């Protein structure tokens, strides 16, 4: 009997149906800087552009790139058949890294690997990616969908993303201007974001909880009760508008000295990446209230505070180091962009470390 690709687990007709659903999700993210390339093998994007609304004319442009994934948060989405927001997570993890340099986001590429083709599910995933690109002001320029039945389980999939941005060299933010007296501002996280989910899943499993459970401690301030899965699947916050509001209202080098995306490793292992020699960042853990999910996980799993701080963002999704004189003004400006922001620490003399100021 003749062998076919379909017999091997890849149906090209179903794949074609999947691909037919994606162009509209891409086109809604386009600006006039995206050049038409229907049927092309690569996406095209103009760096300089003369149009009035999107005018760009760079003097010394530096391209900035970043790549990331969503990790085992995807296991919860797959278990609960909730795929609409993991694409937002994917974009957020990439673009939030990108803007730590002060870069303007340009475009995004995605990679989706699946155990079997499912046009409806793929559309839901890419809808989230498209939503994230709109929020992050990125053009979803292209991507790859790989059907690999021998690599993944029937309902399994994995996501990877790649973002590109640009920054004028003279406006590059790299932390070298951070100095004693600067203030560390914390931008509030939506929750767990996309790190630490192997520990989250272990705690849930070890203590007999189900993803459909409604936990009272996690619903004190919610109008509509949320399940444990809904709390954990809250999408990673995208901070493009917040950082852009700082850049557009202040002289960057005078005000904005450093930006750190708080992901795996927590505040300590991410903020110290941008500290120059001779300074420490002294963080006051009492300066903000972490999202309820963190306290619940710590108590349920009997997790040490040091471990919590190393694995999770603890409610701070991004840290911004600013000139002390402008700290209150910057915090107010970020709040206008819809992100809660408050001082969480100071820069002091030291040895390029993050230290917690314990009570």
Swiss-Prot record:
Biochemical pathway: Purine metabolism; IMP biosynthesis via de novo pathway; 5-amino-1-(5-phospho-D-ribosyl)imidazole from N(2)-formyl-N(1)-(5-phospho-D-ribosyl)glycinamide: step 2/2
Gene3D superfamilies: PurM-like C-terminal domain, PurM-like, N-terminal domain
Primary subcellular site in the record, as a coarse category: cytoplasm
Pfam families assigned to the protein according to its UniProt record, in alphabetical order: AIRS, AIRS_C
Family matches, as InterPro entries: PurM-like_C_dom, PurM-like_C_sf, PurM-like_N, PurM-like_N_sf, PurM_cligase
GO cellular component term, pick one: cytosol
Record carries keyword ATP-binding: yes
Subcellular location: Cytoplasm
Keyword Protein biosynthesis: no
GO biological process terms on file: 'de novo' IMP biosynthetic process; adenine biosynthetic process; purine nucleotide biosynthetic process
EC numbers for this chain: 6.3.3.1
Family designation: Belongs to the AIR synthase family.
PANTHER family: TRIFUNCTIONAL PURINE BIOSYNTHETIC PROTEIN ADENOSINE-3, TRIFUNCTIONAL PURINE BIOSYNTHETIC PROTEIN ADENOSINE-3-RELATED
Protein known as: Phosphoribosylformylglycinamidine cyclo-ligase
Species in which this protein is naturally found: Rhodopirellula baltica (strain DSM 10527 / NCIMB 13988 / SH1)
């Amino acid at each position: 009997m003749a062998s076919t690709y379909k017999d091997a687990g890849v149906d090209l007709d179903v794949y074609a149906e999947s691909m037919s659903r994606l162009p509209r999700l891409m086109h809604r993210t386009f600006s006039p800087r995206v050049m038409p390339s229907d049927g092309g093998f690569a996406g095209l994007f103009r760096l300089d552009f003369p149009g009035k609304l999107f005018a760009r004319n760079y003097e010394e442009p530096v391209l900035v790139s970043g790549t990331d994934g969503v990790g085992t948060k995807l296991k919860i989405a797959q278990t609960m058949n909730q795929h609409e927001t993991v694409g937002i997570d994917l974009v957020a993890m990439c673009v939030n890294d990108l803007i730590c340099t002060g870069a303007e986001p340009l475009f995004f590429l995605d990679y989706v690997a699946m155990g079997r083709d499912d046009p409806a599910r793929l559309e839901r995933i890419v809808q989230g990616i498209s939503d994230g690109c709109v929020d992050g002001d990125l053009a979803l320029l292209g991507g790859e969908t790989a059907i690999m039945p021998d690599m993944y389980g029937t309902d399994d999939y994995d996501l990877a993303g790649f973002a590109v941005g640009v920054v004028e060299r003279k406006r590059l933010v790299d932390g070298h201007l951070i100095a004693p007296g600067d203030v560390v501002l914390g931008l509030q996280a939506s929750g767990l974001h996309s790190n630490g989910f192997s520990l989250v899943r272990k705690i849930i499993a070890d203590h007999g909880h189900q993803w459909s459970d409604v936990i009272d401690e996690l619903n004190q301030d919610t109008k509509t009760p949320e399940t444990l899965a809904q709390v954990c699947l809250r999408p990673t916050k995208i901070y493009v508008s917040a950082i852009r509001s700082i850049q557009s209202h202040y002289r960057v080098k005078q005000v904005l000295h450093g930006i750190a995306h708080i992901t795996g490793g927590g505040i300590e292992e991410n903020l110290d990446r941008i500290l120059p020699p001779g300074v420490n960042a002294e963080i006051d853990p009492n300066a903000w209230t972490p999202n309820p999910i963190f306290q619940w996980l710590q108590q349920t799993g009997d997790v040490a505070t040091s471990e919590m701080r190393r694995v999770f963002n603890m409610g701070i999704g991004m840290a911004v180091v600013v000139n002390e004189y402008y700290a209150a003004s910057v915090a107010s400006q970020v709040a206008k962009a819809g992100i809660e922001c408050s001082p969480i620490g100071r820069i002091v003399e030291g040895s390029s470390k993050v230290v917690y100021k314990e009570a």
